[in-house]
Amino acid sequence: MAKAVGVNGKRAAVLDLRSTDPEEWENDVRPPLKNYADITVYEMHHRDFSLDSVSGIQNKGKFLALTEQGTTSSSGEKTGIDHLKELGITHVHLLPSYDYASVDETKLDKAQYNWGYDPQNYNVPDGSYSTDPYKPDVRIREFKQMVQALHKAGIRVVLDVVYNHTFNADESNFERTVPGYFYRQTKDGQWANGSGCGNETASDRAMMRKYMI
């Protein structure tokens, strides 16, 4: 249920979310869309999109990578948000941006990789994509800056969220909050695995539906 967490998402933080708003955030709006038939979607992973050594992007692999303008590769091609603009897309589909479990945010100097389909805290941006995973406000502010920059570029944002399972049912925040409620179980009391990921959330139960929707 947390909306702010510290490094690796182990503890929630209490903060005024308004303090994380970038300048002019109150004026941020989705770009207009005349017809659904006009939609052109570009799927991207935060880290992959900007990590290349010749991307010309300063904040490689971070939310802020998508706020940098005027970046080019070593051979002069547009990169980053300028590349997205020249493609003429209407939407970016961002692979999981929420806090996920498999990347250790205390060791970002070491090679680690995951698409992010191992949710830990659904309502918090992942710290590995922020410039300081130890500060709860930084990841939120930088995520908002990214969204704001994309909107200003005329690009809508779609978030990829997987609610059908979590990283670890036994140690999940759901299970710690209400044991046995948020996950389906087999007749012998084991975690059901309809997702193929080791567990499956019980979307048929009222509070899980409310959480998702």
Put a short name on every predicted segment.
Residues 1-43, 48-68:
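The feature marks proteins involved in alpha-glucan
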Residues 47-213:
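Substrate-binding/active-site clefts of carbohydrate-active enzymes
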